[in-house]
Amino acid sequence: MHALYKQAAALTEEVIAAAVMVQKHFGIGALESIYVRCLERELELAGHKTSREKVIKINYRGMQFKENLRYDLLIDDCLLIEAKSCEKENMDIWRMQLLTYMKLMDKPLGLVINFGNEHLPTRGVKRVILKGADEETVSF
């Protein structure tokens, strides 16, 4: 099991509740950046550490370079958020985008949150789990 998986999983309900609160305040149709900043504020008020950008090292065939990742939100260094504000959903594309960030940053769990979906808690949120992050390892 990924070292941060349980911590990230424990945060998901709180993050979804905060997202619902933000969506109720602004309704559907606000800019994605507004939703993200307000979600970040809700989580900071609840005592969580947040960030929205990180420089990471990429290694490829003997070449090493730094890349600036502009993910939407990272909470307590373990849960990644990909926020959207669209009526038409492209959930597969959004999940792949989030999964790419999760792999590059070695984060076990992420949430795609579509503030444009009026049924946010049930149909507007998708969990994305890094392969193997939620599995127990058995040693013999």
Task: Identify the residue ranges that each predicted region occupies.
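Short Asp/Glu-rich motifs
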Residues: 42, 62-63, 121
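Solvent-exposed, charged helical/coil patches
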Residues: 1-49, 126-134, 138-140
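Conserved catalytic cores of phosphodiester-cleaving nucleases, focusing on short active-site segments
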Residues: 27, 71-87, 101
